[in-house]
Amino acid sequence: MITLWGRNNSTNVKKVLLTLEELELPYEQILAGREFGINHDADFLAMNPNGLVPLLRDDESDLILWESNAIVRYLAAQYGQKRLWIDSPARRAEAEKWMDWANQTLSNAHRGILMGLVRTPPEERDQAAIDASCKECDALFALLDAELAKVKWFSGDEFGVGDIAIAPFIYNLFNVGLTWTPRPNLQRWYQQLTERPAVRKVVMIPVS
C-alpha cells in the first residue's frame, strides 16, 4: 500500500497526487501540513526530519521518501513503465529538466502571488511585491510558450513528468483572477491539460 501525507491545496502535494492518479495506483492519503498539523509530530519527523509535505511511504518496496520531484521520479520509474517512464535517458532528461526548472524558477514567482495575493488579507497585501511577481511570471510564461511552439507537451510527444511538475503552478496562476498576456501555445497546453481526468480530480480545485 502507498500512503501519502499532505494537504490537497499544496502545489507540491498535487504533483504526487497527479502522478498517483495518472498511474491509477491505489493509495491512502493522510491530510497533513498547515491547518492539519501532523507534520511536526515525532512520528512524522522520524520519517521526514524536514517536517514538510509531501511524504510518501510505499510498503511494497519498503521505501519512505520526501521531496515532491523525487517522489514523482520514483513513482514513474517503479510503476510508470510504458506510461510516465521514458526509456531513453536523453528524452527522459529533456522532460525531467522541467521538474527542476519548475521548483527552482517558476515556484518562486508563483509563491509571490499565492502568498501575497491569495493567502494575505487585502488590507495587508504588498501590491508592489505582487506586481513584481506578476511581471516575473509573465516573462516565464513567454519562455514556456516558446518551448510549446516546438513540442506538444513539456515531456515531448506524450504527457509526462515535466508536465506534472508544471501543471499545479500554471493552474493556480491562471485561476486567481489575474489577466495575463495571451500566450497561444501555453493556452493550448493548458486546455489539453484540463481534459485529463486526473488533472480535473486533484489539480483543478479552488486555489487557497
Swiss-Prot record:
GO terms for cellular component: cytoplasm; cytosol. It catalyses: RX + glutathione = an S-substituted glutathione + a halide anion + H(+). Signal peptide: none annotated. Glutathione binds at residues 12, 39, 53, 67-68. Its EC number is 2.5.1.18. The keyword Magnesium does not apply. Disruption phenotype: Mutants are hypersensitive to bromoacetate. The keyword tRNA-binding does not apply. InterPro entries: Glutathione-S-Trfase_C-like, Glutathione-S-Trfase_C_sf, Glutathione_S-Trfase_N, GST_C, Thioredoxin-like_sf. It is an enzyme of class 2 (transferase). Keywords: Transferase. Belongs to the GST superfamily. Conjugation of reduced glutathione to a wide number of exogenous and endogenous hydrophobic electrophiles. Catalyzes the glutathione-dependent dehalogenation of bromoacetate. This is Glutathione S-transferase GstB. It comes from Escherichia coli (strain K12).
